[in-house]
């Protein structure tokens, strides 16, 4: 589940708050300030680049330049929760907004069913650039795919795959213990060992993480994303189709 799903469950009054959860050291914005759900990891979205590409973008805005025309694939938010959060995050920014997506459409970018389809398109050279989640790009690169990954200058939207406790939980104490483990250094090191960026930086980065790289996360107002999601998906479908 993603934070948007958790926000909807919270709105419906189905989540049990866990005020004592240890959130010190967690990435800002990775957990609900009312302590009803907590991010287990960070999965960021950036730009995958085929190593044979002639140009290398440094920012999201670069993708709207003429040299990238017809060479971009991205996951459709109609099928990808991470893409829906990306859309809801980017369209609220003054430096990107809907203008960015309109520019992508004018540049003949295509929206495909999900991140897997984006990865395949970039890896096989069908497209030179793809909007893609981090670990998929780096895992493919480690297996020999001709892919690099760019952390765009404006920042990266992220999903957090939160953990939460339902009010109907039959064993709330065990549920709290599970949350404690997920948020602990040991739990976060487990996420890192599985190839994900931990929500707690002290747990250490996954093996694929570039030495010296710094990730700037785009702030996301999840409640606003949920509220605007239906309208956003409708507008996106009008631009890129279903």
Language-model segment annotations:
Residues 16-23, 36-39, 61, 129, ...:
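Short beta-strand->loop
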Residues 28-29, 43-44, 70-78, 102-105, 111-112, 181-205, ...:
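Periplasmic-binding protein-like
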């Amino acid at each position: 589940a993603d934070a948007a799903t958790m926000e909807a469950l919270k709105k419906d009054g189905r989540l049990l708050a866990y005020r004592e959860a240890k959130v010190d050291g967690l990435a800002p914005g990775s957990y609900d300030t009312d302590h009803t759900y907590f991010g287990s990891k960070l999965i960021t979205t950036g730009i995958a680049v085929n190593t044979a590409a002639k140009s290398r973008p440094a920012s999201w805005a670069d993708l709207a330049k003429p040299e990238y025309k017809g060479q971009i694939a991205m996951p459709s938010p109609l099928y990808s929760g991470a893409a829906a959060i990306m859309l809801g995050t980017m369209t609220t920014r003054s430096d990107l907004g809907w203008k960015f997506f309109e520019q992508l459409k004018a540049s003949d970018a295509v929206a495909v069913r999900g991140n897997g389809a984006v990865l395949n398109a970039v890896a096989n050279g069908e497209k030179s650039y793809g909007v893609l989640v981090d670990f998929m790009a780096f895992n493919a690169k480690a297996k020999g795919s001709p892919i690099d990954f760019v952390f765009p200058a404006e920042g990266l939207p992220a999903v957090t795959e939160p953990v939460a406790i339902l009010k109907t939980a039959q064993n709330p104490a065990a549920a709290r213990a599970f949350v404690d483990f997920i948020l602990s250094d040991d739990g976060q090191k487990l996420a890192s060992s599985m190839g994900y960026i931990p929500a707690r930086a002290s747990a250490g980065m996954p093996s694929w993480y570039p030495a010296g790289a710094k990730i700037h996360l785009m702030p996301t107002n999840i409640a606003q994303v949920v509220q605007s999601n239906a309208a956003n998906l409708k507008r996106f479908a009008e631009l890129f189709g279903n």
